[in-house]
Structure formats: structure tokens, C-alpha cells
């Protein structure tokens, strides 16, 4: 009986692995969604990617993005087909949560028509027509990984097609050259803070000034009812700087964590 059980488990494990494309594998940074299968996989030692930082469209035959990140480097791209009992939204939410728990800095997050054209994201950005579906059924996230992988970008895109098949695209680009300063939009920061309850901004400088300070001020001004706990080695300095920019002291508390960068916890 024990031998039969071991054989059955072995067959099950082999079947699960056999469903994946030969030679494919998950990204180290991103756990696989349960029962998802890799149906497309590609690695390239050097490839250029242009990732949107805003809605994507085509005007007069030209591709237009509200913002973009352009980088070249080692690319690993894979497409998961999701099990029919789970939605693409569930898989996307799981991926988003995993990346933020790894202290990745969010650069852009959109859903539905806010992303722009699904056809352009599928074909012009990711080069995979399998990812084309209704604009209302898509979601997209771009993050920058924390040190020592600060020159790596991870993009995640989910879609439920018209035939109800759901897919999740995940790819990591390890840039050949150091990435410049990359900032998320205030709307993306606020949306992620509310969705996850917390955020770690690992690329925030120790000295609160310049573009990061302006970004956090604009983020907190989008919803004046939001209160946050600030943690990190320089949280006190950031709180003082935000207060100096007009953010009410009553909206900010200090936490105990001594993490690198700045950690925000939503106080509800």
C-alpha cells in the first residue's frame, strides 16, 4: 500500500511538472500561483524593454505612453495559464502582494481601461498575442527590486480573454547599466497603500528632499483623510520634512522598525 501511494504521488508530481513548457522555470522573486502552468517561456541574454508608466495608446500610427522606463539587459519572461477555478484578478493580487512583501518599489499599477489598450500591452510591450483580451479584464504592475537587485525590474500583467481563459505574464529584466532614479505616480502609491495596508520604499534616500519628498507630499494630499505610520532609520527626519511641507502632524506617527528606506503603514 505504501509503495502504491509513493507511486501515485510520483505520477502526480510528474504530471504537474510535465504541464510546464520544457526548460521553463519560475522567477526567483515571484512564487507561482497554485495550479498555474507555464505555457510560454523565454530567456534572452540581452534585450531592450520599454515598460509603460501610464496608459498606452496609438495615435496617428505612433505608440504613445504617458510615461515609460526603457532598459536593456538579461530578460526572463514567462506566461502562466491560470486554473479555471481562479480569476486573473486573484493571481495578480497574489503577485502584487508577494512583490511588495519583498520590499520592491512600485513604479506603476493600473487596472482595466486605466492601463490603455490590452492589444498594445500584449503585442507591443510583451510580444505575446496570447495576452490580448478585453481592456476591462486587465491589470498591470511594474516594480523595481530592492538592493542588492536594485537594477532589476519586474513586470506583471494579467488578463482574462474573451474565451474566459486567464493568463498571468511575469518577467524580470536585469539591466546592464545602473537604473536612473525612478519614481511612482502619487496615484499608484496611494492605491497600493490602501490595497496592501503598508508599503516599503526601499529606494528613498536617507535625507528627505527633492523628488521623493515632493512625491510623498503629493500622495498624502490626494486623500487628506489618510493617516500613516512612518518607520525606518530616518523616519523622524521624513516626518519632520513632511510636516514642513504642510502635512498635518496628526496624520503621521512614528513606528519602531529600523528598516532601510521608508516604511509606510496605513492607520485606519
Swiss-Prot record:
Residues 185-268 are annotated as: Domain 2. Keywords: Disulfide bond, Periplasm, Signal. Residues 1-18 form the signal peptide. Residues 24-184 are annotated as: Domain 1. It is found in: Periplasm. The keyword Transmembrane does not apply. It holds the Pfam family DUF4892. InterPro entries: DUF4892 (IPR032608). Disulfide bonds join 110-115. GO terms for cellular component: periplasmic space. Coiled coil: none annotated. The keyword DNA repair does not apply. Folds into a unique two-domain structure. The structure consists of two domains, domains 1 and 2, which are connected via a long linker. The interior of the C-terminal domain is not optimally packed, leaving a cavity lined by hydrophobic residues unoccupied. This cavity may sequester a hydrophobic ligand. Monomer. Was identified as a potential drug target. This is Uncharacterized protein PA1624. It comes from Pseudomonas aeruginosa (strain ATCC 15692 / DSM 22644 / CIP 104116 / JCM 14847 / LMG 12228 / 1C / PRS 101 / PAO1).
